[in-house]
A protein has these predicted regions:
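Active-site gating loops and adjacent loop-to-helix segments of metal-dependent hydrolytic enzymes
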Residues: 87-103, 113, 159-178, 213-226, ...
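Histidine/acidic-residue-rich catalytic or RNA/ligand-binding cores of hydrolases
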Residues: 89-93, 161-162, 215-216, 254-260, ...
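Bacterial Sec-dependent N-terminal signal peptides
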Residues: 1-20
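Metal-associated gating/positioning segment near the N- to mid-region
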Residues: 72-141, 159-166, 228, 252, ...
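Histidine-rich, glycine-flanked metal-binding segment
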Residues: 28, 32-75
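Divalent metal-dependent hydrolysis catalytic cores, especially in the metallo-beta-lactamase
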Residues: 108-132, 145-155, 202-215, 243, ...
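His/Asp/Glu-enriched, well-ordered alpha-helical/loop segment
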Residues: 239-243, 308-309, 316-387
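Histidine/acidic residue-rich metal-binding segments in metalloenzymes
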Residues: 189-286, 315-334
């Protein structure tokens, strides 16, 4: 992956100088067609590509910038559809909730830069304490260097569910949580929680439809929302122009999510054919996150790294995710590219290409997904994901 040269380098140059920038590319990846083409010239004015031509076109002015990439392959900036930019390799969800907001703000800016320099110019952040929204705005305003961020803010969970950050803590530590905190136990709670996230500035809504690995509880795959709650979440989100993503390992919670309008399923570990059929018919997407599965399985072998409850779940769930992707891909389930970086280290996002290839997907197809298809689900295909 060392020879993958993305446009992030070019945009840095272009933002500093007012001249045109000419790139002579040895190969160019057409993300829409999922094909590689020979020598091309890319011309950039300011922060926008204004021309893409076959062969090598020389600069028109001596003031123009020339960058020789004849020995390189040039891609659009990659898009990661599952990132947690506020944290890295947590031992449990509790860690983030117990961290100081200021500390999270500083470290998340470091993770953002790592992600950008790894070639990922856009990410979808799927949950934190809310710093992710401020980080998105700071990057958009040019105050911080990092990728373009679409974020869910903080996630929605049922009481005691995977996203309930009070699991494993003293009851008196946090008091009674409700929709504002992301805790949903009724359709009315669901409606309020979505509206609160819209008010906070979220771009997406994220729910934990089933149990998970990194919370201190026994549940790893049980359904954690009712059909009525999920329907209310997706309907309210749609009213405000938002789509919904669902963390899900168990099939029942997954099925409920897709049946009630969730657009992307994260992980999908124990998916059954009935849910794959439903995803195909409703054009819902699987975001595999093989990187996270491999990483938690690896860390489960490190003595005392995880709480015993988490370690047991990591050993069970982690090793299955790559095979799940293989089954879903062969079955014809729509796939997006996402790593769950934050659970795994930031800056290593591109390892997912290798893992997807190991599980049967050709590299050019995963590159197509990480650019063109990911841009489409973000409704940004006219400005992102292709050169």
């Amino acid at each position: 992956m060392k020879n993958l040269i993305t446009l992030l380098i070019i945009l840095v140059f272009s933002s500093v100088y007012s001249q045109s920038t000419y790139l002579h590319c040895g190969q160019l990846f057409d993300s829409k067609k999922a094909k590689f083409f020979g020598p091309h010239t890319i011309v950039i004015d300011g922060e926008k590509i204004t021309s893409v031509a076959k062969g090598y076109v020389n600069p028109k002015s001596e003031n123009d910038i020339f960058i020789d990439l004849k020995s390189k392959t040039v891609y659009p900036g990659f898009i990661d559809m599952h990132v947690h930019i506020e944290t890295q390799v947590p031992q449990s969800i509790i860690q983030l909730s117990q961290s100081k907001t200021a500390d999270i703000a500083f470290t998340s800016s470091v993770y953002a830069r790592k992600t950008l320099m790894a070639g990922f110019t856009t990410i979808r952040d799927l949950g934190g304490v809310g710093v992710n929204i401020s980080l998105r705005d700071a990057i958009n305003e040019g105050k911080v260097i990092g990728p373009r961020i679409f974020t869910a803010g903080n996630i929605l969970s049922s009481t005691g569910g995977h996203g309930d950050f009070t699991n494993g803590t003293k009851k008196e530590s946090y008091g009674i949580l409700g929709p504002k905190d992301g805790i949903v136990d009724s359709p009315d709670d669901a409606r309020k929680a979505v509206r609160q996230r819209y008010k906070n500035g979220a771009d997406w809504i994220k729910i934990t439809a089933t149990g998970g690995v990194l919370d201190i509880s026994k549940s790893d795959a049980n359904p954690q929302f009712t059909n009525e709650e999920i329907y209310t979440i997706t309907k309210t989100a749609s009213d405000y122009g938002l789509k919904v993503a669902a963390h899900a390992h168990g099939d029942e919670g997954m099925y409920r999510a897709v049946a009630n309008g969730v657009k992307t399923i994260e992980h999908g570990t124990l998916i059954k054919e009935r849910t794959m059929d439903l995803m195909i018919s409703k054009k819902a997407y699987l975001v595999p996150t093989i990187s996270a599965g491999k990483f938690v399985a690896k860390m489960a072998e490190t003595p005392n790294f995880f709480h015993p409850l988490i370690e047991e779940k990591a050993r069970k769930i982690g090793p299955q995710i790559q095979n799940t992707f293989n089954r879903a891909y062969k079955y014809g389930v729509p796939i997006l590219f996402g790593t769950d970086s934050g659970v795994s280290p930031h800056g290593e996002n591109a390892k997912e290409f290798i893992y997807m290839n190991e599980a049967g997907m050709p590299i050019n197809e995963s590159l197509h997904i990480a650019t063109f298809e990911n841009a489409k689900i973000l409704d940004m295909e006219n400005s992102l994901g292709q050169i």
